Regions:
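Short beta-strand elements in bilobed, periplasmic/extracellular small-molecule ligand-binding domains
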Residues: 38-52, 132, 150-175
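Hydrophobic alpha-helical segments within soluble ligand-binding/sensing domains
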Residues: 107-133, 172-180, 200, 241-259
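Flexible loop/turn connectors
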Residues: 179-282
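Periplasmic-binding protein-like
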Residues: 11-12, 68-75, 132-135, 165, ...
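Alpha-helical recognition/docking segments in bacterial nutrient-uptake
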Residues: 9-121, 182-186
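N-terminal helix-turn-helix DNA-binding module of bacterial transcription factors
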Residues: 1-8, 281
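Short, solvent-exposed amphipathic alpha-helices that sit
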Residues: 25-43, 115-118, 140-160, 202, ...
Length: 282
């Protein structure tokens, strides 16, 4: 075991064990992010230690025992970060964290609001003025994507009520049951904006099994532009975020902190853009 200064170990804290009802590392976004961090870290002569972060004490124990030089943290909220930083004096960069107020910690994320706005604006321009927004939570990135979507839907003077924000269960079997229950409403709305590619692709497969055609009967959009977005048929219209770039920026900033540099900007918000493919009927 390495001790003292200069362990050259970077801890990657994963704050959730499950995503979409499966192990979090099975999620395309998480896998690509952590895979990029691992490759770039080793290119810099460091090593990656993956740490389960649901127990803050577990992070404290492992990071202290192995004397990690810094932490990249995915899936923590402000309260969890505060609790960890009180117990552990390490350099930390959070990824996709959302405080209640202004940022007081180092974070690397994306412009979730803009992505939601771009999707909402596009669907509205295609005539889907009653499109629904579908997500697994009502917080963090899901919430900001909804706010952008809502703003775009209302820019022509209309009203996008909270009832158009559909929250679906985290477990797959319960989600599919919810899709079946909401099918009449989905068909009436004619367009669904999902807060992740994973859920959008899952829904397209569900509709196919039910004999419902995408986009002829229901238009579907995702968010992230994962590797699977262009593999499914129809190819998924989605919001592209540069996941390798997010990983690169987070690691680059952590290395600067480790080397004693001061970072003036607290929140780095990487841009996103709409990718039009075949899952929306224009």
């Amino acid at each position: 075991m390495l001790s003292g200064h200069g362990s050259r170990i970077i801890g990657v804290v994963l704050g959730f064990s499950y995503a979409h009802g499966m192990q979090s590392l099975q999620d395309p976004f998480v896998g690509e992010l952590i895979g990029t961090i691992q490759m770039e870290t080793e290119e810099n002569g460091y090593y990656v230690m993956l740490i389960g972060g649901e127990s803050i004490q577990n992070v404290v124990d492992i990071a202290s025992k192995w004397n990690v030089e810094g932490l990249l943290i995915l899936g923590y909220n402000e309260e969890q970060y505060r609790s960890l930083s009180r117990r552990l004096n390490k350099k930390m960069i959070l990824i996709d964290a959302y405080p209640e107020g202004a940022y007081t910690f180092q974070n690397v994320g994306i412009d979730d609001y803009s992505g939601g706005y771009q999707i909402g604006e596009y669907l509205y321009s295609c005539g889907y003025k009653k499109a629904l927004f579908v997500a697994e939570t009502e917080r963090d990135s899901d919430y900001y994507r909804w706010m952008g979507f809502k703003q775009a839907m209302e820019k022509q003077g209309g009203f996008c009520s909270r009832s158009r924000y559909i929250v679906i269960p985290g477990k797959r079997n319960l989600r599919l049951r919810k899709y079946r229950e909401l099918l009449p409403r989905f068909l009436e709305a004619k367009a669904l904006a999902f807060s992740s590619d994973y859920n959008a692709i899952e829904a397209i497969n569900f509709f196919f099994d039910e004999g419902i055609m995408v986009p002829e009967q229901i238009s579907v959009t995702g968010y992230d532009d994962s590797v699977y977005a262009s593999m499914i048929r129809p190819k998924l219209t989605t919001v592209h975020q540069d996941i390798p770039q997010k990983a690169h920026v987070a690691l680059e900033r952590l290395m600067k902190l480790i080397q004693g540099e001061t970072l003036n900007e607290l929140n780095i918000k990487n841009p996103v853009y709409l990718v039009k493919r075949d899952s929306v009927k224009e």
